[in-house]
Amino acid sequence: MLKYSFRALCAAGLMLMASALAAQDSPSKEFAIVDLSANMIREVPDYAGELGDQALMGTVVEILERKGYWVKIRTPEPYVGWVNEMGLAVRSPEEIDRWLSSPRYICTALLTRIYEEPSVSSAFISDLVLGDILLKVLKANGEPLAKKGFLAVETPSGKKGFVRKDELLDFRAWADERLRTQESDPERFRSDLIRTAACFNGVPYMWGGTSTKNVDCSGLSRTVFFANGILLPRNASQQIHTGEDITIPCEGELADYSVLQKGDLIFWGRKATEDKPEKATHVGICIGGGRFIHSSQLVRINDASTYSRIPLRGRRIVGQVDKKGSGIISVRRSPWYFKQ
């Protein structure tokens, strides 16, 4: 496989995203790494502005514009919105290359903290959520620095601390394993998706939420799949165009969900008419047995037979990742997460 730097990928328009994001060559192009556990992305540069998305710590973003202490960014999904400048570590393309090549950890706990010392009784530096990415702190011999059941870490902005060892995995090894399982053992991978989704049960709904703190409907599907090494677009209206289309037979007010497999996405919304196109406004994840999990007021499980809304269609993600035209890319093969 040819090796490309992050700068070269930007210049050549080879940023392989879920929606085929391409960046144009520009000597003034700026990048940053998210430095908060779940950075709030707003539609306008104002704290009163609508929340549109969240970006997780360690995620590389492109800087598009500045207005006061607000910065307009583009995320890997891609999603464009405004964040506070203090939630970013601004870096040159060369520094981004080094970040993408450096040994890193991914947080596998739903919620945890970075501590100043290897002890839960010490002061904490930052909170963490599932999917946050941190630099490894290494000893002189290149081995990870570990103390008393904790691993030493560094945030994108350079703050150092400790996280419990059982709450982190090597990022590259994790991404390799997720990709390998998805390709070689899809049934196990589907079960992994459902186990991850079940961890969100009871999490409050929040419009724009895309973390274990709060999620909206598409934020749940996006976060569950990311936690298993797959990048989905941000919104339901985009996710409905990814993967393989699955027609859900409907007769009157009854829908036959038996055509779906675990891990398939189910979409509801406005059916196409002569005047208006189809529009997905809600999404859930099939968990088998005629049930699905979704975020509606809070994350919960519903039985399809008692759910009154008629679905638009299903989409099969597993087995379609990294395929041309699928609109889906694995974390391991994304140049926003690893130097390819």
PLM segments and residue spans:
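Catalytic cysteine-centered active-site loop
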Residues: 205-219, 223-260
